[in-house]
């Protein structure tokens, strides 16, 4: 502020000198007319606007709660924040489509509208990321692991982009006589812009006043927390008070000071005849503080064509002059300077584009602003940007003596104070593609960690409960990290949420993790003393309206496996349906565990039926009731109320495997019914392809995939045998009801099948081709993100999750 006062004092002294000089001139011109003297007096005493405070640098009159900003008496604007989409990894035809859609989006703005695209990268501004990794303690005996998990997430952020926050905004400005007229124009424009972005698959939302002020505050105060509410705004108080830094000092010609930071504004000069659509992405990939603004204004089409025609005429004149020179000098008049020929061809091509190819002309100004705490650090970043610019045959030129104007022009306020522009067509402007790779970061209490984005190195945090179909698949070759990824999600869910987690474990490899979290490992085999009753039911079973009816469907599926062949006849189904209400009668009258029927009760009831088919069914059931496979003819004696349950079926044997897996699925359905409306139930099925091989288990699995989500169930199939999985008749139903796929390294044949099935592009496919463990593609709804996860090996969780014997300590 002292510097400001000194500057003001200096200006005052200069004005006083000018005044004395003007008075002297007045004395010397006494003979002039009154009119002349009056004009001179007006000149002397005319008041020039002066900047007295830091707020005067911020170029707006008022920013309303609605998000409308009034720049001056005639100009008003709004801002929209938009997210990234997959462009760099998309299929070639999809990239072309996105490019054309973006060019058409630019074409939709007429000359009365000014557009500013703002791209803001800021270090240390990712509050969302910080809050997402704050897993609260629960005092359940696992808080030491929660602490370890939080530290792991912090270390992953450091390995990645160090908490760099990347934001994208489009600010659109209109001219209007008053606020009412401006509001009407801006609202119509806002709807059109949101609709255009949505058609490109871009998530976008309009910013209200508070959100716009926060964006401005964070640019102008990189190390401060934004604290503002329109409720606390005093009458006649400006919102600028809450976003202005402590000071601005624009005295140096090449830098400026704001608060504790040093900034530098530069103009981006395009020298190349052709540009790459990767260039903007390369600038935004720099892990440092960068602000880039594109000010774009359309030129009236007829005026643009006239302008190009004039250029063409000028070139023709130059050619005639060159011809005359050639004749005078005695050489061939058809030989023209190569630059003139090239320039002429370019102008003709441009004219053709404007007249026949739906191209439009835009006036574009590109401003960069960087800041740091030291000049050395600032210069290093600017040097990085300059290197990229030079690589693309462009230049970054410092705005000497115009740093204040540069800063104003880079703020997302739609104000451009730099009168250096370049004429570009729609296609040339669209080359500055704002899209690179889609991020996946959902700030939710239920969000889980899935690694780092392989392109941007941003943390991937996602909540499957937000998906339309949270059902999932984890696919990968042996050694790709398939089981580890599943275990990491299970552990994360237990640490972060109250969800129940159930595992169907055909290889006995999840026991360590289950015991770490004091869960229950239930060994299901003919030798085991852990018993599951396939006739277990609760009052919420199935849809809850008719639990016995839903249970009957399961029992018939199980008996179809028992009888084999073509399954149950209509007569057999009728007999079973008649018996079931009778064996459950005692339980429904007094729902105690001891009154729950077992297979023996159904066996006895069938044996006593008059029809021969009843006795036939009883005979076919006999081995499972009184014979050697009677493991399922007992009351359940295991604790099914633990948060983490694991059904270990490694020793189940081939004769019992199908029935065993069906019984487990029914126990899971029981759990989902019981938890309905209270908490989610996550069900992980390893070697999932085995369930889809048999008609009954496949049919029951599809029912789970279709109906679980309604009651808070989240099933996940895990397999390494993609070919077997895709051979199932039911795979279409599985894929149609799956919005989450975690795909790790794939064998070549499987890779090709999945590429066709999931429409994976060649650039995306490389992330599942000979990739390292823990690397692959994550499909989350319509989002596809390449990921990598290097989980720290020196952690308790890693020891419990790894399947490599040499790593277990």
Residue ranges of model-derived segments:
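Post-Walker A helix-loop "phosphate-sensing" segment adjacent to the P-loop in P-loop NTPases
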Residues: 492-502
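A short helix-turn-beta junction within AAA+ P-loop NTPase domains corresponding to the substrate/partner-engaging
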Residues: 518-522, 730-743
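P-loop NTPase motor domains
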Residues: 85, 92-111, 122, 282-284, ...
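Hydrophobic anchor at the beta1->P-loop junction of P-loop NTPases
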Residues: 474
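Extended, folded cores of ATP/NTP-driven motor/assembly subunits in large transport
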Residues: 1-437
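Hydrophobic positions on the alpha1 helix immediately C-terminal to the Walker A/P-loop
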Residues: 485
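Conserved P-loop NTPase
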Residues: 758-809
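Conserved lysine of the Walker
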Residues: 482
